[in-house]
């Protein structure tokens, strides 16, 4: 009797355990099935919470989403985008974000190959896809913003001209309300909304830095520009290796274990040296209006502060990104501290690369050279410098670096117009939490590492 009872009990327990095992297996399968679905749902946010901080995802995850939110049959047209490369990038991004607010595809805008305020009679339009990769942009910004071509138009419902307001009475709130109203009703029924008036750089700003950064990350220069920039960087590093190899050769006489000179690293510093005539006039007026004396920097101040960034033990090439045509001072190559070897385009013998391109392309090449430099030093009131620092900040952020204070980091940037530690320039990272692009568009002395 006892044996029979024990046998029944064993079978009962065995059945229960088997049932429990199947339930556990089913639960595991359910979790594995639902996991990618849940991850997909939450990845659309672009940012997840981790230890109460915003964790900015990698480039591929940040921009991965579907394209359902951007209408392909409704378009926004904007005025020709003008001024320098930096202003045109901001104007383009603002046009993209305006199109996003209206849930429309932005018709590919015309850029300007020449400086508007310097060459009014010689303004040269240049197609967007002569500067940036069109298909690459739509691929990287898929689901966020979208570019379209005029060939996509069906011309069924005509064009609605939207006049942008101006003057003091045209406030940020009024501008935003106009855009909201244009996203619905009879205005939205038109195939194309054409904004008339000021160029997009001068429009009111309604978006945080992070949204601009998403657009900037999608802007990839065409291969021709990237190759030209690679040629300049290769020349800089080649000269750096030659100069360092001489130092290594001298040292090798004293130390037989010295590493082969052919393997010597050749880091370089890029300095966006704003000492041109037009800049000095502009910054002096800006200092007078604002009461801030940390905008202009003399070449002596720049040389001294840059010289306090690195040691003078090994020779380091300093590439001077300067608008040669606007420069009225050939002495920028003299007076640098020991160990710093300055080169501008002519001394580097790459001026021929720049001369065969219009102003916008020349600026794009310099932008890439500054972005690829091991150390970048610029002016915090220069939009060009600010956009270079933003790109370098994004590189560091993707590496998990959130600040550069007191530590050695990859892609460090500095502002020479603001004093930092040890009489050097102030370390500089873009504040990705800013609610607008004001500091980048117009400059600021409130920067930090």
Q: Which residue stretches match the model-derived regions?
A:
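N-terminal targeting/anchoring "stem" of glycan-biosynthesis enzymes
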Residues: 2-449
